């Protein structure tokens, strides 16, 4: 890849470092989209032995690129995001991806299509981990930062996404226990 094109891509992706998510970190600072994506990819890295028949390199690639559309629209919490918001983000992302050099434009387009279809083991795993990471981060954030709706949401979020995997179902149960303990402690 031509160095200046790589720099252009990286300058766009850098926006995710400044794009803040709805959730706080354990120290009470807003989490960035880049931080979420990094830890999501780290989760996939450490779970490769649990999913030996899954192309974990592909899952990690999905994790790394999944929120790039938020470079253009910012982060909108899932419970506030409308179909119009999703369409706008998808359109801006598609426009950006189409301007990437080959073969990256085709690879990213194929990954996004696979992620949206949620038909492959890789796409389903990426989506489940994406949602689980969000709940883990909420469990790590001060409870004073939670919205009232998040008390129930954090107990059920991702349940349907993990159902395909006994391991993820067990992980979700452990995360739910952490949520219940956090609510019980009130911290």
Task: Show which residues each predicted segment covers.
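Active-site helical microenvironments for divalent-metal-assisted chemistry
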Residues: 1-187
